[in-house]
C-alpha cells in the first residue's frame, strides 16, 4: 500500500503549476523536509496500528522530485550528487523503520526516469539505480517494486492500452531487471499484469519474486481466488483504459471501473 501524504498542502499545490516544481523542491526549507518525513512515518504507523501486514513507500511525487537530477537543484544534503538526491527517500525509510520496528516489512516502489521514452522527469535514471537501490537497502527496505516516474502526465506512470511505448503486459519489466542486478531482496513490478500465465512465467524465470497489480484488482477483485480455483476463464480482464479508475479519481467522481456490471 502506498501510504504517504503529499509533500505540499492543497494551498501550496494550488500556488504553482508543474513548471514550478523545480523551484519548489530546490527552495524547500529543511523544516518542511522534516515535516514531509514525519508525514510518511505517521502514515506507516497508522497502517501498522490498524493491522496491515506491510507498508509500501511510494517513491513518487515529492520523493521522485527530490530524486531527479532534472528537478532537484538543491545545494545541501538533499541535492546535487546521486547519493544526496537519494537522501530524502532513505531518511523516510530510516524514520519509518525506527517507528515500526525491525520485523515489519517495508517495500519501496521506485519510479524511474528513462530518456528512451517520452515521459516526465521524476525519479532517478536507470543508470542511477545502483546507487538508489543499495542506499535504500542499507536504510532498511525489505523489497522493491519497479515503476515509471513522471511529473507531467499520469498516463506515463499508469500506462493505458493505447500508450505508444508501453504496449503489452509487464511493460516495466526492463526496470525490475535492472533493480535485480543490484539486490538480492525480493523485487516486484507494476505495469499491466493481468494474465495469470504471464505472471507465473515471470516468477518461475526469476525475473520477479512476486507480482504488483492494481488496476486488474479493481477490474476484478476476485482475480486471485479465480486463479487459485482454476477459473481463469472467468476473470474480468482489465483493458487498461484508465477511464473509470483513474478518471474517476481525477474528476473527483465516484470510484469505479468501466467493466463493473
Over which residues does each language-model region extend?
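Flavin-dependent oxidoreductase catalytic cores
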Residues: 1-261
Amino acid at each position: 500500500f502506498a501510504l504517504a501524504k503529499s509533500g505540499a498542502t492543497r494551498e501550496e499545490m494550488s500556488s504553482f503549476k508543474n513548471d514550478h516544481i523545480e523551484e519548489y523542491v530546490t527552495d524547500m526549507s529543511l523544516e518542511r523536509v522534516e515535516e514531509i518525513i514525519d508525514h510518511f512515518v505517521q502514515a506507516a504507523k497508522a497502517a501498522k496500528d490498524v493491522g496491515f501486514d506491510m507498508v509500501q513507500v511510494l517513491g513518487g511525487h515529492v520523493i521522485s522530485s527530490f530524486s531527479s537530477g532534472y528537478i532537484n537543484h538543491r545545494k545541501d544534503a538533499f541535492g546535487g550528487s546521486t547519493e544526496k538526491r537519494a537522501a530524502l527517500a532513505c531518511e523516510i525509510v530510516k524514520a519509518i523503520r525506527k517507528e515500526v520496528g525491525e520485523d515489519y516489512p517495508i517495500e519501496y516502489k521506485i519510479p524511474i526516469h528513462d530518456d528512451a521514452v517520452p515521459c516526465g522527469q521524476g525519479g532517478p535514471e536507470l543508470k542511477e539505480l545502483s546507487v538508489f537501490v543499495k542506499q535504500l537497502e542499507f536504510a532498511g527496505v525489505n523489497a522493491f517494486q519497479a515503476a515509471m516516474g513522471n511529473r507531467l502526465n499520469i498516463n506515463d506512470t499508469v500506462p493505458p492500452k493505447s500508450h505508444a511505448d508501453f504496449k503489452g503486459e509487464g511493460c516495466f519489466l526492463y526496470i525490475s531487471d535492472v533493480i535485480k542486478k543490484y539486490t538480492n531482496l525480493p523485487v516486484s513490478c507494476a505495469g499491466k499484469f493481468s494474465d495469470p500465465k504471464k505472471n507465473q512465467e515471470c516468477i518461475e524465470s526469476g525475473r520477479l519474486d512476486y507480482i504488483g497489480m492494481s488496476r486488474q484488482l479493481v477490474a476484478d477483485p476476485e482475480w486471485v481466488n479465480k486463479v487459485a480455483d482454476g477459473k481463469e476463464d472467468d476473470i474480468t480482464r482489465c483493458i487498461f483504459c484508465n477511464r473509470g479508475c483513474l478518471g474517476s479519481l481525477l474528476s473527483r467522481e465516484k470510484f469505479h471501473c468501466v467493466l463493473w456490471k
